[in-house]
Amino acid sequence: LAIPLPDVVTAELFAAIVQGEINGDAGYQKWADNETDEEVVRLLRLNGREETIHAGRAQKVFELLSAS
């Protein structure tokens, strides 16, 4: 699946990417809250935590690029 990407990623767009990762965690947690299968719940919560980890890495990239 080809997804068109912008030629330039602005600071504003990058901040939105970080926020999207954080929101992704909340979405997975809410989804998990509504499931009854323990393995499904575990996997959804794990995916959510990974979204927060992604957000932290993306934030670090933003900080490094902003410092230069």
Give the location of each predicted region.
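Non-heme di-metal
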Residues: 1-68
